[in-house]
């Protein structure tokens, strides 16, 4: 737990409240959303986080938003092999061809899928009786995330293992993993 200059206690990973990561913690992470672009952003950042650290991916968040058309799945689904080739050369993002192509494929899956990503997310909601005491109490995955990942893969999503799906669930508020004492925790 850290207390920022604004006096708000936050999860330690968010920092002191002075930068983008703290704003993300305060305004986005763990906040329930049904917005398709916000959900796709969370899914995409999770795809790029596989094998890397969150700080690396988060540091490129604005560049990803630009590269992936504001995280609008309908617009991303129209991207071509030429667009993928162009993004592989874009030094402002993580230039992993497989992850870039997975993002395009995931947009297509999201548009075609039934039930929708939002409906699936709601069906795997996790309710806690109390907030975790510390980050060490947080799981990296759950049975719900394993089942959710399996269903997403069946719908054609890629790079969606149980760990990245659990991170997605945290990000979009399907589970509230703000730690006890954080002003965003549900105690």
Question: Residue spans of the language-model regions?
Answer:
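HhH-family (HhH-GPD) DNA N-glycosylase catalytic core used in base-excision repair
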Residues: 1-187
């Amino acid at each position: 737990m850290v207390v920022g200059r604004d006096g708000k206690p936050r999860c330690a990973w968010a920092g002191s409240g002075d930068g983008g990561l703290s704003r993300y913690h305060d305004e986005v992470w763990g906040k329930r959303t049904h917005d398709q672009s916000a959900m796709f952003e969370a899914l995409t950042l999770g795809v790029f986080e596989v094998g890397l650290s969150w700080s690396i991916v988060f540091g490129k968040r604005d560049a990803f938003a630009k590269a992936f058309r504001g995280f609008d799945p309908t617009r991303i689904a129209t991207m071509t092999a030429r667009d993928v080739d162009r993004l592989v050369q874009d030094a402002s993002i993580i230039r992993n061809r497989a992850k870039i192509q997975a993002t395009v494929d995931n947009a297509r899956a999201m548009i075609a899928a039934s039930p929708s990503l939002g409906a699936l997310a709601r069906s795997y909601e996790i309710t806690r009786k109390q907030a975790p005491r510390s980050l060490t109490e947080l799981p990296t995955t759950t049975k719900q995330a394993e089942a959710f990942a399996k269903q997403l893969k069946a719908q054609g999503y890629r790079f969606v293992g149980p760990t990245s799906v659990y991170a997605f669930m945290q990000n979009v508020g399907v589970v509230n993993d703000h730690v006890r004492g954080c002003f965003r925790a549900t105690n």
